[in-house]
Amino acid sequence: MEFIKKLEVWFIVGSQDLYGDEALKQVYANAKQITQYLNSRNPFIQIKLKPLATTPEDILAICRAANYEENCAGVIAWMHTFSPAKMWIAGLTRLDKPLLQFHTQFNKYIPWNEIDMDYMNLHQTAHGDREFGFMVSRLRKPRTIVVGHWQSESVKQKLDRWMRVLAAIYDQQHLKVARFGDNMREVAVTEGDKVEAQIKFGYSVNGYGIYQLVNSINAIKEEDIATLVKEYEADYQLVDSLKEGGEKRQSLIDSARIELGLKAFLDKGGFKAFTDTFQNLYGMKQLPGLPVQRLMAQGYGFGAEGDWKTAALVRAIKVMSYGLPNGCSFMEDYTYNLEDHNEVVLAAHMLEVCPSIAEDKPILDIKPLGIGGKEDPTRLIFTSKAGCATASTIVDLGNRFRMITAELQAIAKPQDMPNLPVGHAFWKLEPDFDTGTQAWILAGGAHHNVFSLDIDADMLRTFAEYFGIEFIHIHAKTELADLKNELRWNDVAYK
């Protein structure tokens, strides 16, 4: 995630020449103070103050410059005074970076004894931002609005959350996804229009032969494998058969070789997300379980069975949640515990669940895998942390992409499961099991999802809105009749 350190957000402050030089100097001084304060609080992305925007020509020049500045991830616009919005038409029409409208004002409180018309003219965000907001709406331009005083903790949190989405948007527009093999045969939802995805999101998806990956795996040096195995021993609880001298020790060494070869291939090609499928493993000793789990923990996106849309979304949410404590993972609704009025989803996958979500130190084990026809694969076994969470997916409906995000309550495991050989999570659906399940299925939600304990639906909505894709939110107040209407209306709106 080193690229995040290079990013910047441009702060554009609107006014007009009508107020005169002294007032404009004060506007800029106030904007500079706000910028310095926000940057002093370690924002996710640093803010760069630009010259005042007081004429149509100024605004157009700044917006064009933002488009062409590679490291500019987005733009914050604030109307300190009134800034006639027709001046903003040319610039906003051309701006293609994410936009945040910052509805704040320099002074937190009205100076009751001193306030006069000079003060009123200088501090006009209350109606200056309404003028600006009208034009953004008139142009049908997506934007995030943050309301509140610039020194408040809630504003800092809102700005940081928006910046995290910016980083994910930036990354998607530069992302390369590698596919090893094709889709799992006859599976529908993992298919999709890769050309349209590149047009809409910016990321590219290309396929590579398993032999190319195998060549990379076979080129790994023995000393590098030994170093990685020591890392395994330090980070995880190894079962006896994988410890030095154990009867399955060679399988652990093979896993290390696969991990290093896979990472080398991805890094050489600049890929930050990838897919594989158990039906295309020619030349490999085992399906990559542990290697995929560890690469996800390092920030790579992943989708099983050729699911490139989910691989890209895992990567996006990995970027959004960089530095946060609870993790996210590729995931699948697997089976249910249907106790009356206490239904629980057991979510997992064959192998590939990211240990960033683990509650405790994972167990590194080796177990048979009934599909794929290869040697027993190593894998990390653990239970997810508990807490508020989301499950998200993107599906291709033929004429558009739809993102679906469901709010969840991840819970501690109800009972021990000594024979379950995979990483897993337990959750309860919002608003209840029946409604939440029906809502996901009605919306066409995939059987794969991205499970996150850090990223909420509002952030994912912002992500979807920027790319102009449909967003369906399943939450504690979801009513099926309302959802059916929303889906019906969206079919018309997105034609």
Swiss-Prot record:
Catalytic activity: beta-L-arabinopyranose = L-ribulose
EC number: 5.3.1.4
GO annotation, biological process: L-arabinose catabolic process to xylulose 5-phosphate
Cofactor note: Binds 1 Mn(2+) ion per subunit.
Pathway membership: Carbohydrate degradation; L-arabinose degradation via L-ribulose; D-xylulose 5-phosphate from L-arabinose (bacterial route): step 1/3
List of residues binding Mn(2+): E305, E332, H349, H448
UniProt entry keywords in alphabetical sequence: Arabinose catabolism, Carbohydrate metabolism, Isomerase, Manganese, Metal-binding
This protein's record includes keyword Chloroplast: no
GO MF annotation, one: L-arabinose isomerase activity
Cofactor: Mn(2+)
A GO CC term assigned to this protein in UniProt: cytosol
Pfam family, one: Arabinose_Iso_C
UniProt record similarity statement: Belongs to the arabinose isomerase family.
Main function: Catalyzes the conversion of L-arabinose to L-ribulose.
HAMAP family: Arabinose_Isome
The protein, known as: L-arabinose isomerase
Gene source species: Actinobacillus succinogenes (strain ATCC 55618 / DSM 22257 / CCUG 43843 / 130Z)
Gene behind the chain: araA
